[in-house]
């Protein structure tokens, strides 16, 4: 059941769980509908995307807190959001997924296109953006050479609109920007055509090669939450606790010296307080009880240390990212023991992998079935997106000997191509098999040539030269 969590105040659009936009199927957007979505998107930017980006680049809220008069004002930032996102993005997307087809000719063409379109880099940027914002997009377009290209679009630059059916199919993708005068320009991408717009004016539709909406949304969970969305308050509390800790250190460094019972009044009889030299004195009639000492307050160092350590542990625990600096990852722990420590992050990556494969398959469907899809695979095989195999390999330290041994054992019950895919560093198992076959063929020819009598070797060599010519 689709639950409407917000009705956009302008136009016919609605918002469901995860800040997902929906619109009546078969309809196109008018100006009112478009700006209803853009206004909600702007609010989403202010409420989520901008704060998340600020925290990722270490511009935390504590830096904007007002200064306190006559007090220490340390504002320390612990870059936990960047640490969590980069650690997980490297683990999940540090190794680009392999994309393969069974047909050798089409697979070779596909690998060339993947390299030419810099798919690995685009994929890594999507993984990072999903970690920060909770979602990201991949947009297909035609380059200047009329060849299909792809580019990632961050959620503060565009948004997807789905239809209101139970399957929630993509209905339109909007990419837009604002200039320094706050004028809005952009493009609405539909299936079969696009519409440019500027401010409150929609241009005439322009047909293009894409038979479906040429954009796909990537996300790791239906709620569209980023890696550190659930631990923001803990991170802010950590910044505050560490800053207070630094304030306390400064306090003891800058403690006031108190002098009692000494007649050090100025000529006007005023009690002198020197805030620059941090010195306070007060005369006392009984000079025999004069006292000079530093003013201090109770030391809460142990309590602060416990709070800081507890916050750090909670941030790692609730974000399901392991603390690689923890003592649990040192020593000679077995591979199985380390796998258990990584289990929460592995589970999260497994969920995200399924979501990403679903989105990637949809994108290749758009590419293969387009009017110029024959530039990637043969047009007759435009349905081959159904046969695509996506393989994700987690980026983590590997025991190559164990990996090779596992692949060898697996080859007895699996295909050689599947077994090779288990070995880290092999991005294209099919190409590796072809190279292996070529090596075996060349080795066999050399062995046969060496086994022949000398008077026959020359003839074989001549035959090989003639065949090459």
Predicted regions and their residues:
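Extended, regular secondary-structure scaffolds
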Residues: 127, 131-132, 137-224
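Short, charged/polar micro-motifs that form catalytic or ligand-binding hotspots
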Residues: 113, 128, 294-305, 346-353, ...
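C-terminal helix-loop subdomains that flank or include functional centers
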Residues: 283-285, 310-324, 328-469
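Extended, charged amphipathic alpha-helical segments
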Residues: 8-9, 204-337
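Extended hydrophobic-aromatic, low-complexity segments
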Residues: 30-34, 56, 63, 304-306, ...
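Short amphipathic alpha-helical segments
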Residues: 106, 114-122, 130, 230, ...
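Extended, helix-rich architectural segments
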Residues: 1-149, 464-469
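Glycine- and charge-rich intrinsically disordered segments
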Residues: 1-15, 239-246, 250, 256-261, ...
């Amino acid at each position: 059941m689709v639950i409407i969590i917000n009705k956009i105040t302008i136009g016919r659009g609605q918002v469901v769980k995860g800040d997902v936009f929906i619109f009546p199927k078969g309809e196109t957007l008018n100006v009112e509908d478009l700006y209803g979505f853009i206004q909600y998107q702007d609010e989403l930017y202010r409420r989520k995307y901008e704060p998340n980006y600020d925290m990722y680049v270490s511009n935390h809220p504590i830096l904007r807190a007002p200064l306190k008069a006559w007090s220490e004002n340390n504002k320390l930032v612990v870059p936990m959001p960047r640490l969590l996102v980069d650690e997980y993005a490297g683990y999940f997307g540090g190794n680009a997924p392999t994309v393969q087809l069974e047909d050798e000719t089409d697979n070779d063409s596909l690998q060339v296109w993947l390299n030419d379109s810099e798919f690995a880099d685009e994929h890594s940027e999507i993984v990072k953006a999903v970690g920060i914002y909770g979602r990201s997009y991949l947009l297909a377009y035609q380059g200047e050479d009329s060849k299909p290209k792809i580019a990632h679009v961050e959620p503060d630059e565009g948004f997807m609109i789905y239809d209101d059916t139970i399957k929630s199919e993509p209905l339109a993708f909007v990419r837009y920007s604002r200039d320094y005068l706050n004028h809005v320009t952009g493009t609405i991408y539909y299936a079969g055509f696009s519409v440019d717009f500027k401010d409150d004016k929609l241009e005439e539709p322009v047909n293009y090669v894409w038979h479906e909406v040429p954009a796909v949304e990537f996300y790791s969970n239906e709620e569209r939450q980023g890696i550190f969305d659930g631990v923001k308050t803990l991170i802010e509390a950590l910044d505050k606790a560490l800053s207070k800790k630094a304030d306390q250190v400064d306090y003891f460094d800058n403690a006031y010296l108190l002098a009692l019972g000494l007649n050090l009044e100025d000529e006007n009889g005023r009690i002198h307080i020197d805030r620059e030299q941090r010195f306070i004195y007060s005369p006392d009639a009984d000079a025999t009880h004069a006292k000079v000492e530093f003013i201090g307050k109770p030391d809460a160092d142990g309590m602060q240390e416990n709070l800081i350590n507890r916050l750090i542990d909670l941030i790692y625990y609730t974000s399901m990212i392991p603390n690689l600096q923890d003592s649990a990852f040192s020593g000679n722990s077995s591979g199985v023991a380390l796998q258990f420590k990584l289990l929460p992050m592995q589970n999260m990556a497994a969920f995200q992998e399924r979501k990403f494969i679903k989105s990637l398959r949809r994108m290749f469907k758009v590419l293969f079935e387009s009017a110029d899809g024959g530039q990637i695979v043969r047009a007759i095989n435009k349905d081959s997106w159904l046969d695509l195999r996506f393989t994700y390999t987690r980026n983590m330290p590997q025991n190559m000997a164990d990996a090779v041994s596992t692949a060898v054992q697996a080859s007895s019950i699996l295909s050689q191509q599947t077994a090779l895919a288990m070995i880290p560093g092999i991005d294209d198992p099919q190409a590796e098999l072809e190279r292996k076959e070529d090596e075996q063929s060349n080795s066999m020819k050399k062995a046969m040539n060496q086994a022949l009598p000398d008077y026959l070797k020359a003839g074989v060599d001549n035959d090989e030269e003639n065949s090459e010519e």
